[in-house]
Amino acid sequence: RTDDCKSNGEAEVGFVGRVLLNAFNAWEYGWESDRAELKENSLKVFDSYLKNGFTEAGFFKEFVNLDRNFEEPVHSIRRQSEGIYAMLHFLAYEKEQGRRHSEWEQRMKKMLDMFMQLQNQDGSFPRKFRDDFSIVDKSGGSTPSATLPLVMGYKYFKDKRYLDSAKKTADYLENELISKADYFSSTLDANCEDKEASLYAATATYYLALITKGEEHKHYADLTKKAAYFALSWYYLWDVPFAPGQMLGDIGLKTRGWGNVSVENNHIDVFIFEFASVLHWLSKEYKEPRFADFAEVISTSMRQLLPHDGHMCGIAKVGY
Protein backbone atom coordinates (compact mmCIF):
# COMPACT_ATOMS: atom_id res chain seq x y z
CA ARG A 1 0.00 0.00 0.00
CA THR A 2 1.37 3.39 -0.98
CA ASP A 3 -1.24 5.51 0.79
CA ASP A 4 -0.02 4.79 4.35
CA CYS A 5 3.28 2.84 3.95
CA LYS A 6 2.51 0.75 7.04
CA SER A 7 4.34 -2.52 7.60
CA ASN A 8 2.27 -5.57 6.68
CA GLY A 9 4.39 -8.03 8.64
CA GLU A 10 5.70 -9.77 5.52
CA ALA A 11 9.29 -10.59 4.60
CA GLU A 12 10.04 -12.13 1.22
CA VAL A 13 13.41 -13.33 -0.09
CA GLY A 14 12.55 -13.06 -3.79
CA PHE A 15 9.87 -12.14 -6.32
CA VAL A 16 8.26 -8.87 -5.12
CA GLY A 17 10.19 -8.84 -1.82
CA ARG A 18 13.91 -9.18 -2.62
CA VAL A 19 14.66 -8.29 1.00
CA LEU A 20 18.21 -9.68 0.88
CA LEU A 21 19.03 -7.81 -2.32
CA ASN A 22 17.63 -4.62 -0.78
CA ALA A 23 19.86 -5.24 2.23
CA PHE A 24 22.91 -5.69 -0.01
CA ASN A 25 22.12 -2.54 -2.01
CA ALA A 26 21.80 -0.59 1.24
CA TRP A 27 25.03 -2.18 2.54
CA GLU A 28 27.02 -1.25 -0.57
CA TYR A 29 25.57 2.26 -0.71
CA GLY A 30 26.10 2.68 3.03
CA TRP A 31 29.83 2.05 2.62
CA GLU A 32 30.10 4.26 -0.47
CA SER A 33 28.25 7.17 1.14
CA ASP A 34 29.44 6.68 4.75
CA ARG A 35 25.89 6.09 6.02
CA ALA A 36 26.26 4.16 9.27
CA GLU A 37 22.50 3.64 9.70
CA LEU A 38 22.24 1.89 6.33
CA LYS A 39 25.07 -0.48 7.21
CA GLU A 40 23.54 -1.20 10.62
CA ASN A 41 20.10 -1.95 9.17
CA SER A 42 21.61 -4.18 6.48
CA LEU A 43 23.55 -6.20 9.04
CA LYS A 44 20.38 -6.67 11.08
CA VAL A 45 18.70 -8.20 8.02
CA PHE A 46 21.64 -10.47 7.20
CA ASP A 47 22.10 -11.59 10.81
CA SER A 48 18.37 -12.21 11.25
CA TYR A 49 18.19 -14.41 8.16
CA LEU A 50 21.35 -16.28 9.09
CA LYS A 51 19.89 -17.05 12.52
CA ASN A 52 16.19 -17.50 11.71
CA GLY A 53 15.75 -17.54 7.94
CA PHE A 54 16.51 -21.13 6.94
CA THR A 55 14.32 -24.22 6.92
CA GLU A 56 15.27 -27.55 8.44
CA ALA A 57 16.61 -28.79 5.08
CA GLY A 58 18.59 -25.59 4.52
CA PHE A 59 16.43 -23.68 2.05
CA PHE A 60 15.43 -20.07 2.65
CA LYS A 61 12.20 -19.37 4.49
CA GLU A 62 11.25 -17.52 1.37
CA PHE A 63 7.99 -15.89 2.48
CA VAL A 64 6.92 -15.24 6.07
CA ASN A 65 4.26 -13.13 7.74
CA LEU A 66 5.50 -12.36 11.22
CA ASP A 67 2.20 -10.76 12.28
CA ARG A 68 0.34 -14.00 11.54
CA ASN A 69 3.21 -16.34 12.47
CA PHE A 70 3.01 -17.84 8.97
CA GLU A 71 5.75 -19.50 6.91
CA GLU A 72 5.06 -20.51 3.31
CA PRO A 73 5.58 -24.31 3.27
CA VAL A 74 6.05 -24.55 -0.50
CA HIS A 75 9.37 -23.36 -1.96
CA SER A 76 9.84 -21.82 -5.40
CA ILE A 77 13.01 -22.08 -7.48
CA ARG A 78 12.48 -18.40 -8.32
CA ARG A 79 12.58 -17.03 -4.76
CA GLN A 80 15.28 -19.44 -3.61
CA SER A 81 17.46 -18.46 -6.59
CA GLU A 82 16.97 -14.75 -5.98
CA GLY A 83 17.99 -15.18 -2.35
CA ILE A 84 21.25 -16.94 -3.30
CA TYR A 85 21.85 -14.33 -6.02
CA ALA A 86 21.61 -11.54 -3.44
CA MET A 87 23.90 -13.22 -0.94
CA LEU A 88 26.55 -14.09 -3.53
CA HIS A 89 26.61 -10.41 -4.51
CA PHE A 90 27.12 -9.60 -0.82
CA LEU A 91 29.83 -12.22 -0.36
CA ALA A 92 31.69 -11.17 -3.53
CA TYR A 93 31.59 -7.52 -2.46
CA GLU A 94 32.83 -8.41 1.00
CA LYS A 95 35.61 -10.57 -0.43
CA GLU A 96 36.80 -7.60 -2.51
CA GLN A 97 36.97 -5.55 0.70
CA GLY A 98 39.01 -8.24 2.45
CA ARG A 99 36.14 -9.52 4.59
CA ARG A 100 34.81 -13.10 4.68
CA HIS A 101 31.62 -14.61 6.11
CA SER A 102 32.28 -18.35 6.42
CA GLU A 103 28.86 -19.28 7.79
CA TRP A 104 27.10 -17.56 4.90
CA GLU A 105 29.51 -19.22 2.46
CA GLN A 106 28.69 -22.65 3.88
CA ARG A 107 24.96 -21.93 3.70
CA MET A 108 25.14 -20.83 0.06
CA LYS A 109 27.31 -23.78 -0.97
CA LYS A 110 24.86 -26.17 0.66
CA MET A 111 21.96 -24.55 -1.19
CA LEU A 112 23.73 -24.78 -4.54
CA ASP A 113 24.44 -28.45 -3.85
CA MET A 114 20.74 -28.96 -3.07
CA PHE A 115 19.87 -27.21 -6.34
CA MET A 116 21.79 -29.87 -8.22
CA GLN A 117 19.70 -32.52 -6.44
CA LEU A 118 16.56 -30.79 -7.70
CA GLN A 119 17.71 -30.45 -11.31
CA ASN A 120 16.11 -32.81 -13.83
CA GLN A 121 17.94 -34.78 -16.52
CA ASP A 122 16.81 -32.33 -19.21
CA GLY A 123 18.40 -29.46 -17.27
CA SER A 124 15.16 -27.99 -15.95
CA PHE A 125 14.22 -27.15 -12.38
CA PRO A 126 10.76 -27.69 -10.88
CA ARG A 127 8.84 -24.46 -10.37
CA LYS A 128 7.71 -25.35 -6.81
CA PHE A 129 8.76 -27.99 -4.27
CA ARG A 130 8.70 -28.77 -0.56
CA ASP A 131 11.44 -28.96 2.05
CA ASP A 132 11.70 -32.74 1.57
CA PHE A 133 12.38 -32.19 -2.17
CA SER A 134 8.93 -33.49 -3.17
CA ILE A 135 7.66 -31.70 -6.27
CA VAL A 136 4.57 -29.46 -6.14
CA ASP A 137 4.81 -27.98 -9.66
CA LYS A 138 7.12 -29.70 -12.15
CA SER A 139 6.83 -26.95 -14.79
CA GLY A 140 10.27 -25.86 -16.01
CA GLY A 141 9.42 -22.27 -16.92
CA SER A 142 11.24 -20.84 -13.87
CA THR A 143 14.48 -22.66 -14.72
CA PRO A 144 16.46 -19.59 -15.91
CA SER A 145 16.22 -17.97 -12.48
CA ALA A 146 18.49 -20.76 -11.20
CA THR A 147 21.12 -20.18 -13.90
CA LEU A 148 22.27 -16.89 -12.38
CA PRO A 149 23.26 -18.13 -8.90
CA LEU A 150 24.81 -21.26 -10.42
CA VAL A 151 27.12 -19.17 -12.62
CA MET A 152 27.84 -16.84 -9.70
CA GLY A 153 28.49 -19.84 -7.45
CA TYR A 154 31.00 -21.17 -9.97
CA LYS A 155 32.80 -17.82 -10.02
CA TYR A 156 32.83 -17.46 -6.23
CA PHE A 157 33.54 -21.04 -5.12
CA LYS A 158 35.53 -22.14 -8.23
CA ASP A 159 33.38 -25.31 -8.31
CA LYS A 160 32.94 -26.47 -11.91
CA ARG A 161 29.88 -28.56 -10.99
CA TYR A 162 27.89 -25.34 -10.71
CA LEU A 163 28.95 -24.21 -14.18
CA ASP A 164 28.04 -27.61 -15.63
CA SER A 165 24.64 -27.35 -13.95
CA ALA A 166 24.15 -23.85 -15.37
CA LYS A 167 25.01 -25.08 -18.87
CA LYS A 168 22.41 -27.83 -18.52
CA THR A 169 19.79 -25.17 -17.76
CA ALA A 170 20.77 -23.42 -20.99
CA ASP A 171 20.24 -26.66 -22.93
CA TYR A 172 16.71 -26.81 -21.52
CA LEU A 173 16.09 -23.13 -22.25
CA GLU A 174 17.24 -23.53 -25.84
CA ASN A 175 15.23 -26.69 -26.48
CA GLU A 176 12.00 -25.86 -24.66
CA LEU A 177 11.70 -22.08 -24.38
CA ILE A 178 13.88 -20.10 -26.78
CA SER A 179 13.66 -22.30 -29.89
CA LYS A 180 9.88 -22.59 -29.45
CA ALA A 181 9.38 -18.94 -28.41
CA ASP A 182 7.29 -20.35 -25.56
CA TYR A 183 8.21 -18.50 -22.38
CA PHE A 184 6.05 -19.45 -19.41
CA SER A 185 5.61 -19.83 -15.64
CA SER A 186 8.38 -17.58 -14.34
CA THR A 187 6.21 -15.14 -12.41
CA LEU A 188 4.59 -16.47 -9.23
CA ASP A 189 1.31 -14.54 -9.31
CA ALA A 190 0.13 -16.43 -12.41
CA ASN A 191 1.00 -19.67 -14.21
CA CYS A 192 0.99 -18.84 -17.90
CA GLU A 193 3.00 -17.17 -20.66
CA ASP A 194 4.80 -14.20 -19.10
CA LYS A 195 7.39 -11.52 -19.74
CA GLU A 196 9.71 -12.51 -16.93
CA ALA A 197 10.39 -15.96 -18.41
CA SER A 198 11.85 -14.41 -21.56
CA LEU A 199 13.61 -11.69 -19.57
CA TYR A 200 15.16 -14.30 -17.27
CA ALA A 201 16.09 -16.55 -20.23
CA ALA A 202 17.95 -13.64 -21.84
CA THR A 203 19.73 -12.84 -18.58
CA ALA A 204 20.64 -16.50 -17.94
CA THR A 205 22.23 -17.01 -21.35
CA TYR A 206 23.94 -13.60 -21.01
CA TYR A 207 25.63 -14.83 -17.81
CA LEU A 208 26.86 -17.91 -19.66
CA ALA A 209 28.05 -15.81 -22.61
CA LEU A 210 30.10 -13.68 -20.21
CA ILE A 211 31.88 -16.70 -18.75
CA THR A 212 32.61 -18.63 -21.99
CA LYS A 213 34.76 -18.07 -25.07
CA GLY A 214 34.84 -18.80 -28.79
CA GLU A 215 31.98 -20.72 -30.39
CA GLU A 216 30.41 -21.46 -27.01
CA HIS A 217 30.32 -17.74 -26.23
CA LYS A 218 28.77 -16.98 -29.62
CA HIS A 219 26.12 -19.66 -29.13
CA TYR A 220 25.02 -18.27 -25.76
CA ALA A 221 25.13 -14.70 -27.12
CA ASP A 222 22.87 -15.69 -30.02
CA LEU A 223 20.42 -17.25 -27.56
CA THR A 224 20.50 -14.07 -25.48
CA LYS A 225 19.69 -11.96 -28.52
CA LYS A 226 16.79 -14.20 -29.54
CA ALA A 227 15.27 -14.22 -26.04
CA ALA A 228 15.80 -10.47 -25.65
CA TYR A 229 13.89 -9.69 -28.84
CA PHE A 230 10.98 -11.69 -27.47
CA ALA A 231 11.18 -10.04 -24.05
CA LEU A 232 11.07 -6.61 -25.70
CA SER A 233 7.78 -7.51 -27.36
CA TRP A 234 6.18 -7.15 -23.91
CA TYR A 235 7.18 -3.48 -23.63
CA TYR A 236 4.89 -0.60 -24.55
CA LEU A 237 5.94 1.67 -27.42
CA TRP A 238 3.06 4.06 -26.78
CA ASP A 239 1.35 5.91 -23.94
CA VAL A 240 -1.81 4.21 -22.74
CA PRO A 241 -4.61 6.66 -21.86
CA PHE A 242 -5.89 6.56 -18.27
CA ALA A 243 -9.45 7.20 -17.17
CA PRO A 244 -9.95 10.31 -15.00
CA GLY A 245 -9.39 9.55 -11.32
CA GLN A 246 -6.84 6.77 -11.83
CA MET A 247 -3.76 7.49 -9.71
CA LEU A 248 -1.15 6.88 -12.42
CA GLY A 249 -3.03 9.04 -14.88
CA ASP A 250 -3.49 11.81 -12.32
CA ILE A 251 0.29 12.04 -11.70
CA GLY A 252 0.96 12.12 -15.44
CA LEU A 253 2.61 8.72 -15.95
CA LYS A 254 3.60 7.91 -19.53
CA THR A 255 3.57 4.15 -20.16
CA ARG A 256 6.01 4.00 -23.08
CA GLY A 257 8.96 1.87 -21.94
CA TRP A 258 7.01 -0.03 -19.29
CA GLY A 259 6.43 -3.77 -19.70
CA ASN A 260 3.26 -5.79 -19.39
CA VAL A 261 3.37 -8.84 -17.10
CA SER A 262 1.61 -11.90 -18.47
CA VAL A 263 -1.41 -13.05 -20.43
CA GLU A 264 -3.31 -13.41 -17.13
CA ASN A 265 -2.14 -10.21 -15.43
CA ASN A 266 -2.66 -7.35 -17.84
CA HIS A 267 -0.89 -4.54 -16.02
CA ILE A 268 2.40 -2.64 -16.34
CA ASP A 269 5.30 -3.71 -14.20
CA VAL A 270 8.63 -2.26 -13.10
CA PHE A 271 10.47 -5.60 -13.05
CA ILE A 272 13.71 -5.30 -15.05
CA PHE A 273 16.79 -5.70 -12.80
CA GLU A 274 19.72 -6.61 -15.12
CA PHE A 275 17.81 -6.63 -18.41
CA ALA A 276 18.90 -3.09 -19.29
CA SER A 277 22.53 -4.19 -18.84
CA VAL A 278 21.84 -7.17 -21.10
CA LEU A 279 20.45 -4.83 -23.77
CA HIS A 280 23.48 -2.52 -23.58
CA TRP A 281 25.77 -5.56 -23.87
CA LEU A 282 23.85 -6.89 -26.88
CA SER A 283 24.07 -3.48 -28.50
CA LYS A 284 27.88 -3.64 -28.36
CA GLU A 285 28.15 -7.36 -29.10
CA TYR A 286 26.07 -7.16 -32.28
CA LYS A 287 26.61 -3.49 -33.17
CA GLU A 288 22.84 -3.01 -32.94
CA PRO A 289 22.09 0.43 -31.43
CA ARG A 290 18.36 -0.27 -31.07
CA PHE A 291 19.04 -2.46 -28.02
CA ALA A 292 20.81 0.36 -26.17
CA ASP A 293 18.29 2.93 -27.39
CA PHE A 294 15.37 1.00 -25.98
CA ALA A 295 17.23 0.29 -22.73
CA GLU A 296 17.36 4.07 -22.31
CA VAL A 297 13.63 4.36 -23.04
CA ILE A 298 12.95 1.77 -20.33
CA SER A 299 15.31 3.38 -17.81
CA THR A 300 14.09 6.94 -18.27
CA SER A 301 10.44 5.88 -18.29
CA MET A 302 10.73 3.95 -15.04
CA ARG A 303 12.39 6.88 -13.32
CA GLN A 304 9.09 8.74 -13.67
CA LEU A 305 7.91 6.93 -10.54
CA LEU A 306 10.97 7.59 -8.40
CA PRO A 307 9.61 9.85 -5.64
CA HIS A 308 11.42 13.07 -4.75
CA ASP A 309 10.55 16.42 -3.21
CA GLY A 310 7.47 17.79 -4.92
CA HIS A 311 6.88 14.53 -6.81
CA MET A 312 5.87 11.83 -4.32
CA CYS A 313 3.97 9.70 -6.87
CA GLY A 314 1.13 9.02 -4.43
CA ILE A 315 3.51 7.55 -1.82
CA ALA A 316 2.66 8.61 1.72
CA LYS A 317 6.13 8.75 3.31
CA VAL A 318 9.58 9.97 2.36
CA GLY A 319 12.01 7.09 1.97
CA TYR A 320 9.58 4.57 0.44
Positions of predicted regions on the chain:
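Glycan-recognition and catalytic cores of secretory/periplasmic carbohydrate-active enzymes
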Residues: 1-320
